[in-house]
Structure formats: structure tokens, C-alpha cells
Amino acid sequence: MPNTAKKHREALAKIDRSRTYPLVEGIESVKSAAYAKFDETVEVAVRLGVDPRHADQMVRGAVVLPNGLGKDVRVLVFAKGEKEKEAREAGADYVGAEDLVTKIQEGWFEFDTAIATPDMMGVVGKIGKLLGPRGLMPNPKVGTVTFDVGRAVKESKAGKVEFRVEKAGIVHAPVGKVSFDADKLKENLLALVEALLKAKPSAAKGTYVKKISISSTMGPGLNLDISDVQAKLV
């Protein structure tokens, strides 16, 4: 524990919390400050000028990160017949229907994302209270309720990230691992920001993107220069 505390202090010393960092410098600083023995996830927090208590200011969506997440995503699909076959051929880890519902009711959650064909939602609805709080409930707004299960599976495997604004108006999302080079993390972060801009509610007034911060799982966070980030969007 003392050794961990020392490493954290050393990591904090590498970050100037009083300034905002240009995008690339910020990413490189987060990479250099990471100290855990495992490959830490690089996480982004974006504070938006919305009040999610109002339905017309909810921000929700998904984006396929161009360089993936650096981890194996376990995909579960609720489907039958030809769609079951399509899901398996696309690389889904688990495919089924009522049998999977039973396993989940018994406490099994060994998967990272769930996809369902629309005709299966009546079955999936039985476990909505189990999947919902874990962020695993299939939803048409993020493309996980669809008949195009092959595409949905491939996107999830490739590094699809779902995002949803929280009560404080903040969106949290992973953009890769500290082992990624800075350019790959930059491309992933820009893809996320672009998706957030596209998801801007028409009811949102004033400044939309108020703050962007980045950190690793164990390391300290820092604030990015919003104007520099937006200038790099294609």
C-alpha cells in the first residue's frame, strides 16, 4: 500500500492540474503518468451543457472507435433461426433465446454487451430489471436491437462504445489502453467527441461541450483544451 501511494504521488507530480492541455500533449502526459502493473484503460469524461432530467436534453448513442478498445469484447445475442446462424457466423460468443434468459436469471453475466432481434424483445423484457442497471439492456437507440445482427456483432467486437449522459451532465467513456500509441488514442477520442456533437439535443442551449478531461484507470486526470480538440475534428 505505501508503495502504491508513493507511485500515485509521483504520477500526480507529472500533471499540472492548473492548466488545460493540448490534445496530444494531454494524451502523452496521461500515458507517462500511468503506473499500474496492468494495461490501464484510458478514460474520457465530457461535461455537457445539458440537463438530463429533461427528456428533450438526453444525450445517448454509440460510436465504433477506429482503433478499438484493446480488449476482447464478449458479445451475447438473443436470436432464433437464421438470425441465430448469422450471429454465430459474425463471431458472437453466446447466442440463444429462453435458455440465455434462464442463465441470466440464475446470476450469469459473463458478457460485455447484449444484442437482440426486435422479435426477441418480449423474451428479453423478462430480464430487463437485471440487464438495465448493468447497462446491458439491448436498445434500438444504440443499435443493439436490430435484425442486422451480423453487423451489430462485428461493430461490438471492433470496439463499439455506448454512451449516455449522467445526472450531472457528464458522459464517461473508454477510448483505449495506455499501451496504445498517442495517435490511436487521439483518433478514438476525436471519434467519441464527434459522436457527442452529432448527438446534441436540439433543446440544448448555450455552450454544449463545457469540459473534457482524460485519465487512466489508476492515474491522475487532466483537462484538455476544448478548442484544440475541436480544431482537430475533420
Curated annotation (Swiss-Prot):
InterPro entries: Ribosom_uL1_bac-type (IPR005878), Ribosomal_uL1 (IPR002143), Ribosomal_uL1-like (IPR023674), Ribosomal_uL1/biogenesis (IPR028364), Ribosomal_uL1_3-a/b-sand (IPR016095), Ribosomal_uL1_CS (IPR023673). It holds the Pfam family Ribosomal_L1. It comes from the Bacteria. Gene3D superfamilies: 3.30.190.20, 3.40.50.790. Keywords: Repressor, Ribonucleoprotein, Ribosomal protein, RNA-binding, rRNA-binding, Translation regulation, tRNA-binding. GO terms for biological process: regulation of translation; translation. GO terms for cellular component: cytosolic large ribosomal subunit. One of its GO terms (molecular function) is tRNA binding. HAMAP family: Ribosomal_uL1_B. Binds directly to 23S rRNA. The L1 stalk is quite mobile in the ribosome, and is involved in E site tRNA release. Protein L1 is also a translational repressor protein, it controls the translation of the L11 operon by binding to its mRNA. Part of the 50S ribosomal subunit. Belongs to the universal ribosomal protein uL1 family. This is Large ribosomal subunit protein uL1. It comes from Geobacter sulfurreducens (strain ATCC 51573 / DSM 12127 / PCA).
